[in-house]
């Protein structure tokens, strides 16, 4: 697979010109809106000054009018500032989507990216890790990739439950000497898992489900309730690799087959993957060779929302870091597929 050095060489030769042209188009829209806002504020200021000149006495009415105009001027200035700030973030987001897709195009001609699409709930449920009967599921940034005839997909995932909350509003009526209490009911979202779902196939076929669940104090302490929402089945299996047992709990109904699947080579590959992407992960090895990896606190959305300082130009370092994060995802398939 092409690496960061190849991409930066491509950037210097061709891509810089292509990206700069796309950024310039968005810049024109931003500065056009900025000019309109500046013109509006100048007009407000001129009207403000003229009113002071025309009604420049010291009457209470005039002072009140000036005060109200000052509030109006400050309010419009604040609103316009927020509008511009939101537009800057939106432009940064749009540029990052362009960069994301251009990096995918550089790495492969066979990919699909749909920003507002999630993995079908039926396919997600088939991995059998989280219990979707009691969890709500949302997803976005669906990406399917084919590199060297190896197909895999990933998308952002949010799994959450809700609980009813009650907000009380109290009002005391002195005339009737009565305390009125109104209860407002609303649902509070409780996130259980937020991260990336990654699905691929490995050459080594499995005969039964095997689950790897993170096994350390921090995971249990921070997500002590997550086990209530995991629906995997099987018996806990102790492997001969003590270090691996300390990292992951292994569950399966077939101890012999799970030991065959989790060979020393595959465990080394999982350790290599953990070094590449340090976020905690849940692994599901299915019977047909499919593997589902749930990577906690890692999303494409966070990557796309990172501000890129487009007004001063997209730096080579920013592009290199962006490329690394995407190539790490695409290398998961390369690392984990044991021949």
Predicted regions and their residues:
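Cytosolic juxtamembrane N-terminal segments of multi-pass membrane proteins
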Residues: 1-35
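Transmembrane alpha-helical segments and their cytosolic interface motifs
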Residues: 31-47
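Charged, low-complexity intrinsically disordered regions
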Residues: 101, 105-108, 117-161, 186-339
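Membrane-interface amphipathic/juxtamembrane segments adjacent to transmembrane helices
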Residues: 6-12, 87-108, 112
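Short hydrophobic alpha-helical membrane-anchoring segments
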Residues: 45, 49-57, 75-82
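Mixed-charge, low-complexity intrinsically disordered segments
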Residues: 162-188
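Hydrophobic alpha-helical transmembrane segments
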Residues: 53-72
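Transmembrane-cytosolic junction motif
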Residues: 31, 74-99
